[in-house]
Amino acid sequence: MKIVHIITRMILGGAQENTLLSVEGQQDDWGDDVTLITGPSSGPEGSLLERAAEGKRQVRILPELRRAIDPWKDWRSHQTLTRWLRELRPDIVHTHSSKAGILGRSAAWKLGLPVVHTIHGSPFHAYQSRVAHQAFRWAEWWAARRCDRLISVCDAMTSQYVAAGIAPTDKFVTVYSGMEVEPFLHPPRPRDEVRRELGVSPQDVVVAKVARLFELKGHDDVIAAAPQVLASNPHVRFLFIGDGVLQGPLQQQIAQLGLTPHFQFTGLVPPQRVPELLGASDMVVHCSLREGLARVLPQGLLAGRPVVSYDIDGAREVVIPQQTGCLLAPRDIPALTAAILELAGDRDLRERLGSTGRRLFTEQFRTQTMTRRLREIYQQVLDQRRNGRKQSA
């Protein structure tokens, strides 16, 4: 099968990892002819572009394809995408992220090519202006009429899009975002060795948070909970895994509270280090205020660690209270404090929740499960096209 994936940028992030693993799995496991089209990848978050271009993978960089809205560059991107897709003539076009999703779907539909789009997270949300919210909502409504199928990374994304009037329920299908599960099940290095490198003592309880240091990711909420947590349990250590523009301000905030010795920032780490860092931790906390389904939640469970998360978007599909972790109302700092303290003080509870999560979700989040489901969806779309049922919302 000839497939083209289009994504705005290949920074270190959940949507990008999903796209990269789809490309690799389709080419390596299924023998497909796969091309990845993306814009430039730059910034403190790090890039997956080098890995994407390894071996014989076909990667095309579209210089004008940028995240920020720029009418001239967006028009140029659309023209180039149309030209490249006309040249490549793929069986399926698969778009990801908002900008590439809108431009890519438009170009593919214009050429009559079968096209699907993955919703990794909603571009319209409660934390933006009304004008921006309405603009993104309209753009998604418009683009939904120019694709054959919408793939959600969790059921919550489907519910939000249907409620917003983007498309009817029968246009959506959920495919959980696959990942390489083995490094989480069996970390490449022993837990004790990694903890020693981090300067963590055997009695310390490490609370890990994996996310870009960026707005709405919830690092400030963890910091707000820390004084009460440490007053009750001074053995807790907070590990922030990731880089971003807020590292300086967050470190300053921690210093003002006199808590610098209790926090550690790893900075930018390659994805292959995340499993061993989670393995060296004792629980995973994720306080983001908007996500599709944060990959770190199943990753924490695959590592055998309980997870604490705000009840937003798809979190409740993997964070099951009393079974795999703690689900909290957003921005409820007292509840966040209590959840961290409960888990920090009960090793048996941590092990029970983590092992249950590992048992429930390992197969569901395997890369191979995702690529198999994607192929089934592609085939359904192609069959519908052959039968003259080009779907529109």
For each predicted feature, which ranges?
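N-terminal strand-loop element at the rim of the active site
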Residues: 5-13, 17-73, 245-246
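A conserved mid-protein helix/loop that constitutes part of the nucleotide-sugar donor-binding site
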Residues: 16-24, 205-228, 245-251, 334
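Short alpha-helical donor nucleotide-sugar binding micro-motif in glycosyltransferases
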Residues: 81, 85, 268-269, 276-281
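A short, active-site helix/loop in glycosyltransferases that binds the activated sugar's phosphate group
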Residues: 146-172, 179-184
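Aromatic "clamp/platform" in nucleotide-sugar-dependent glycosyltransferases that forms part
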Residues: 289
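Short hydrophobic beta-strand element within catalytic cores of glycosyltransferases
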Residues: 306-309, 319
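Conserved acidic donor-binding segment of nucleotide-sugar-dependent glycosyltransferases
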Residues: 321-322, 326-333, 342-347
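A short, well-ordered alpha-helix in the C-terminal region of glycosyltransferases
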Residues: 335, 342, 349-364, 370-376
